[in-house]
Amino acid sequence: MKKKFITSSFLLLIGGLITKLLGMIIKIIISSRIGINGLALYMLVLPTFSLLITVSQAGVPLALSKLVASSNKRPHELYSTLLLFLGVYNIILLFLVLISANFISTNLLHNNSCYLPVIGIAFVIPFTTLSSIIRSYFIGIGNMLPPVISNLIENFIRFIFAYYLLGFFTDYSTSIIVFIIIIFNIVSELISTLFLLIFIPKRKRRITFNNSYLKEVMCLAIPNLFSSFIGSFTYFLEPIILLLLSSSNNISIDYGILTGYVYPLLLLPTFFVNATAQALLPILSNSNNKNTNKLLRFIIFIILLFSIGTTFVFLLFGDKLLLFIYHNYFGFKYLRILSLFSFFLYIQPIFSIIFLSIGKTKYIFYTTLVSSFIRLSTMIIFLLFDFEIYSLIYSFLINVFCTFIYQIYLIKKEDILLF
């Protein structure tokens, strides 16, 4: 068990590190090419992108990995059934987004420039869903190499676009540039998906449909969908509420700085936690608590040390990191505040995997529901007292701490000894 976990963790850790670094480089290049106004527009539509991806995937990827890892059903029949189902579902969703794009940009985001980016998002989501399903299949069977390499290929293609091709479009309007950035995801997703298909034996590429498999997957996926949807919907509402309740004329710029500069840097270390969580899922799904408690305690201890280290780095060298990465100091004061609660943020994926592995997907839903309520309600309260962008920052801190306490309560309820 430990050997498999170490091997899987190592592959995901290295792949996650390279992917995060490539992603950071891509963000640097894009932000320098499109400027602060372009970045603000891009970050304004990003929550919509996240919400639609969540809806398009319907909570299936995690459920597929869980069932493939823990059941004796034929894995290829599981994923092919889901490909057919989600293929039809995503085509319907694409047309619905195209029809409602004008309403989303005008009435929700209050910015007509968001129209073209939303159109771009509609065409990207089916390709994102396709690659996500195939990656989840490989994670479920414990073969981490194909998804790791496909992620690297996807980000390398995006890097080539950002570095070599994006410069040809800088004379266009901000709306068109953001549309092009979003629509290029189709190319990167398609190439990475074709690479994944190489690792699937030809005899297993035949598409079949099994209705009983679909029902079983959806029973596990629906709680995941509700959980992910609530989280993404909360993220989607944040800029809408900020624009609605804030009296500052620069709130969209401040939001772009926070979500475009600070959050990516704060979340950069999560490659370590996400890699560990993904590697844990197949192992926890096939083990009992007695065999895994010791391993889980060790992992939490490592994440604690890791979080303390990142906090000190952000506090002492955050301004230098921002200058080195983005060539400006925008958001340093935000970063210093947010880094103080990094442990409570970084530990959450581990808890979610624990809940999934013991079949308590409802706990993930409860956690997301509590988290979203705390985040939105506290943000609204702070906005009413004119805290402006700090409303989002303070609500973020309160949210991650309260969510951590609630997750500990749920874990103790299941007699899992982590501390």
Segments predicted by a language model, with ranges:
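Interhelical loop/hinge segments that connect adjacent transmembrane helices in multipass membrane
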Residues: 1-2, 174-182, 197-231, 413-419
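Signature of the first transmembrane helix
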Residues: 4-62, 94, 98, 124, ...
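Residue-level signature of transmembrane alpha-helical cores of multipass secondary-active transporters
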Residues: 12-16, 50, 86, 120-121, ...
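Helix-loop junctions and terminal segments of transmembrane helices
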Residues: 57-72, 266-290
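Membrane-water interface segments that mark the loop-to-transmembrane alpha-helix transition
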Residues: 58-102, 290-310
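Short membrane-interface helical motifs at transmembrane helix boundaries
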Residues: 92-112, 169, 309-328, 332
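Membrane-interface junctions at transmembrane-helix termini in multi-pass inner-membrane proteins
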Residues: 127-150, 340-369
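Membrane-interface helix-loop junctions in multi-pass transport and translocation proteins
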Residues: 141-146, 156-194, 359-362, 372-405, ...
